[in-house]
Every structure is written in C-alpha cells, then in structure tokens.
Amino acid sequence: MARTTPIERYRNFGIMAHIDAGKTTTSERILFYTGVSHKIGEVHDGAAVMDWMEQEQERGITITSAATTAFWSGMDKSMPQHRFNIIDTPGHVDFTIEVERSLRVLDGAVFVLCAVGGVQPQSETVWRQANKYSVPRMAFVNKMDRTGANFDKVVEQLKARLGAYAVPMQVPIGAEDGFEGVVDLLKMKAIHWDTASQGTTFEYRDIPADLVDVATEARSFMVEAAAEASEDLMDKYLNEGDLSEQEILSGLRERTLKVEIVPVFCGSAFKNKGVQAMLDGVVHLLPSPADRPPVQGIDEDEKEDTRAATDTAPFSALAFKIMTDPFVGSLTFFRVYSGTLNSGDQVYNPVKSKKERVGRILQMHSNNREEIKEVRAGDIAAAVGLKDVTTGDTLCAQDKIITLERMVFPEPVISMAVEPKTKSDQEKMGMALGRLAQEDPSFRVKTDEESGQTIISGMGELHLDIIVDRMRREFNVEANVGKPQVAYRETIRKSDVKSDYKHAKQSGGKGQYGHVVIELSPMTEEERKSDNVKDDFLFVNDITGGIIPKEFIPSVEKGLRETITSGPIAGFPVVGVKVKLVFGSYHDVDSSEMAFKLAASMAFKQGFAKASPVLLEPIMKVEIVSPEDYLGDVMGDVSRRRGVLQGQDDSPSGKIINAMIPLGEMFGYATSLRSMSQGRATFSMEFDHYEEAPANIADAVTKKG
C-alpha cells in the first residue's frame, strides 16, 4: 500500500505545560478543528476526549499520555493535508516520567502557558526535559480572556526564567473580557474568529489603529529573528528593510529546528480563539520526521549505527509506553523511526533477544481506535499481542539489528506497604501490580523479605494514590495502604578503609575457603561518571599474580553487589561507594564461588562499619505559590520542616517560595498547606538530591529499621 501522506507533511508533536495552563482544553480544540471530535469536550464537566481514564476526568488532571492522529489543511483550508500525531502529556510533577517518555519519541512540542500565571515552577521542569532531548518548540499563551492576562509579561518570563529567545508571531487584540482576536504579524492583518461557528470560520480585518505601532515594532523583531538564519536573508533584510512572507517563515523554521528560537502564539482555547492559527504554526515551524537527525543506535557488533527516516530503510521503532486496555489486553505504543511494518510481521527485540509477532496494529484516537494494516517511518501507533516488550525497548528488522538508546527513568523516592483487604484480592493484587509496573517504569513493586509485606514505590504521594485507585477501578482489587516511607540511602565518609575476612570451614570432607582483603572509599565525582559504575557502586579488581584465581573475581563482585542492596545501618541500599579488591588467598580444593561470595559480603559489612557510615535522605526541590497574607505562616512552616529557603519570586497569585525540604518532612503537606492558606496556596515538588541526615533522624530511622 502506498504512503498516503508524504513524511515531510507529518508532524509528531507533544502538548506540554504545567497544571491549569489549559493544556487539555487546547488539545480538545485541536481535535475539534482537525475534525476528529464532533463535540467539544470540556475539562470542567469531565468530558474531555484526551483525558480518558476515569480518574483523569474526576481529578481534572492528565495522568497518561494519550496519542491521537489528526489531519490539518490549514485554517483557510489552502494547505496540502498534513498528518498530526499528537501526544498530550501530564503537567503534574509526580508524572514527569510520562513527559520524559513522550519527549523521547516526539519531533517537536507546543508549550502551553497561562496568560495570567505565566511561567510556573512546573514549566521550568518540563522545559529542562525538552532541552535534554533538544526538542524544537513553540509556545501558545492561553487564557488571554482571563482577568489578569498579560501577553507581554509572559513573553518576558519566557526570556528571563527559561532563557528562551521568544519571538512573538502575533500580538493580542485586547485582553481579559475585551480579548477579540490576534494580529497576524506575517500578513499584518487582524484575525477575528466567528463565535457562532465555534471558531471554525474567521475573517481578516485591518489592524485596529491603536495597535498599528505595537504590531509594526513586533513584526520588525520577528523579521530580524528570521533574517539571522542565514547570510543571504540578512543581506536582503539589510538592503531592502523587509523579507517576503515565505522568506520569514523559512528563516524562522530553520532557527526553530535548531532550537535557537521559540515562536510565540496566543489565544483562548476555551473561547475558541487562537488554536487554529497555532496549528498553522505547527505546520510552518515544527519539524517533520525527515527534518530531525537520523536516529542513533548500536548494531550487533556494538558499533554506532543510524537509521534514516525513510520507508526503504530497515525497520526500527521504539516502544515508549505499555498500557492495559480493558478490551484488547496489553497495548504497546511505538514510534516508527525507519522502514515499514505490516500487521502479522515478526519483529526482533534486541534488548530481550526475542522475536515477536505483531498481531493487530491500532491507530489511536484518544480512547477510540482504528485498526490499520501497516505503519511507516514517522508513524506512532499501538500494537496488540506483544508479550515481552517493556517501555524503552527497541523493535527492529531481524536481518538488520539495531538497539536504540534506552530511556533513563528516575528512581522512586517514596514507598508504602499495601495489603489486600480479603483473601480473594490477594492473587488479583499481584497481577494488578505487575501490570501497572509494566506500564510505568517509575513505579516499582517488591516484597519485603522480613515482613512479607508488598512494598510499592513511586515518584510522590499522588503517584501512589493513583496506582491504588487504579487497582480498585481497573482490577477490582481493594487494598489497605500503610504510611508512606522515605527511600533513604546509606554511604560512607572515610577513605581507604581496609577490611580482611577469611571464610573457612574445614570439618572433614570438602570444606569451604575464601579469603579477601578489600579497601572501601567514597566515590569521587569523577569516578561516579565512569562507565564501570553500576547502581552507584564501583568495583575495582587490583589483584595481580593470581593470588585469587580469575574465575573467583566475579563471585567477589557478586557478593558485594548483593550486600549493597540492603545496607548495614538500617537495610537501605548503599550508594556512592568504591570497593577495591587488593589481596586474598585461596585453597586448591576447598575454594568455591560461594565461599568467595560470602567472604566478600562479610568483609564489606565489617569494613562499612569502620568507614564512618552515614544515612542519606532525599531532599526535594519545593516551590510554593502563596498569597502575601499567608507568607509568614508558610515560611515558618518551611523552617519547621527543616527546609532551607532558596529565594522568592513574584507571581500574579502572590509570592513563589523556593525551598529545599527533606522528603521525610513533606508527608501530608498538601493538607496542612491548604488549611494554612484557606485553600489558596499551591505547591509542587520534585526530587533534587540526597544529603546526609542529621543524627536524630538517623537514630530514629535506625531504631525503626
């Protein structure tokens, strides 16, 4: 089957923002204007198409990235048809993983900002993630109809807080209740959308007299930004004082693709104004898969390899999300980077070294689906029937193997015990948690060997609340949850601490003999960056002359690695330690892998105790937005929680307080902040780093452990 849309007319982009910027409403309007959705869904009434999980509709926040395919031929229907694959991403910090995984497979992003709130703490987190993957992006300043809306202020914040070279493509006509439309700086015309048709029709008018000077100045700034793309454009601009519409677009596009500039649009998704022109901007300014560099990976011989975004190249794709669907079972969302795949084809998963047959291929439209026969380079789709694929795995052609770079997922910082309410929930709970962990790599499940309890770990309280909620709704499992527990770590402060341990048992028959001498030191920053570091632990073999035979060295390392999973202080994982194997001895008959494993384990425990062991606690970067009236109470409370204030900023809702606070002090903070501020203050937090816990905390944790 021939390709219906050339790859140059594909746009794979994400819609990103902080909570309450109006991201889901913006996505809804996109679906409405591209003809996918015949009725506009509102978040207020829980009918939004993109927020398809029950909990999302109840809580009014987006949790999982829903992928949708739509088509666009321009606001005035004059463009050739473009194919959009849109991914809606959550804005809550506990779901940063969803943003991260969608960024990995996108070519561009639309950054939605609130015209009142501007650049929020969460915006900075999302922006940093987009920088990490060099994602070209444009901004849409939403909610221009709201009281306090200020387009210029948000553009300034983009520059000051995010370091973006923001280039307005429009200026708003009016603001708040008086917001009427926008001035298109390319055409130097005012755009007015028709209210009766919900914005599906529009007309160009002359620019209002009071905006002519503002628009002229803004246009000069835009043209200058375009001219800086190349010497030819700059020469023409300097000689003639202007550029054609086509030249401006080509210069701006070139610079957007290089992530040098961020074009800025504005509107009110809720009032059906502005999203339409922003979609034209997606076509003009964001990349197609063919504009992005070829995807990089490693071939069978561990050599670097690339795949160009063409249908004729060997097939390669990245599985970026696994979901459990009530009707079809497990769905694997994947992005095709090169080649073609037909339903029924076999694919190879080099990460698991397994072949799998792709059953059905589904094109997803939020929670509706359409079955398709094939996918090609640039497509995003979902496969049914893949059993062993996990998030971040590569799928490729069996005869041309490539392993694409895996995704890096953050370590969970909070844990809690869960237990089934009834015997019949017991079995179902294990299956439910297994499925949910397969879907979400930032969520972990383990069994505590001593207590036999099931421990779940995640990125924050909300994250774990929603997991427990999903168990109930999707798997009918009722569970009791314990108090959240902090994921502490253990490490040492003293360097070059020697520990000598001989494991010897000789009581007739074959004995056991393993003898090791190790040196423990804290890892340096340099060492932490080395390729040999795994799980934040470095093993160095300094044995020469066969004092310990080569075949026993891996057993020594294995013994050490097994021991660091549960540290000697309170049973938390050991991090940041380098162990050097410096000496030892062996017995021709009695030495075995097990004996050396045990010797290494005991030597480590004894050495750790002598090396000034300390407990580390996770420190969270917390941003609190509070009205001035409550500032004293809020800041006093931060100090009581052992918080360190990092500074303050102004915000339309009062003051933004930045602080570093230990996670152990943050449980139940949402409730106490609400009561302190009569529900008017908000906060967001993300993990920042580990640091040494004070002695009283370490003692309390040790006693509990």
UniProtKB/Swiss-Prot annotation:
Domain tr-type G: 8-290
Gene Ontology molecular function: any one: GTPase activity
Chief place where the protein resides: cytoplasm
Keyword list, A-Z: Cytoplasm, Elongation factor, GTP-binding, Nucleotide-binding, Protein biosynthesis
SMART domains: EFG_C, EFG_IV
Compartment(s) where it occurs, according to its Swiss-Prot or TrEMBL record: Cytoplasm
Protein purpose: Catalyzes the GTP-dependent ribosomal translocation step during translation elongation. During this step, the ribosome changes from the pre-translocational (PRE) to the post-translocational (POST) state as the newly formed A-site-bound peptidyl-tRNA and P-site-bound deacylated tRNA move to the P and E sites, respectively. Catalyzes the coordinated movement of the two tRNA molecules, the mRNA and conformational changes in the ribosome.
Entry protein name: Elongation factor G
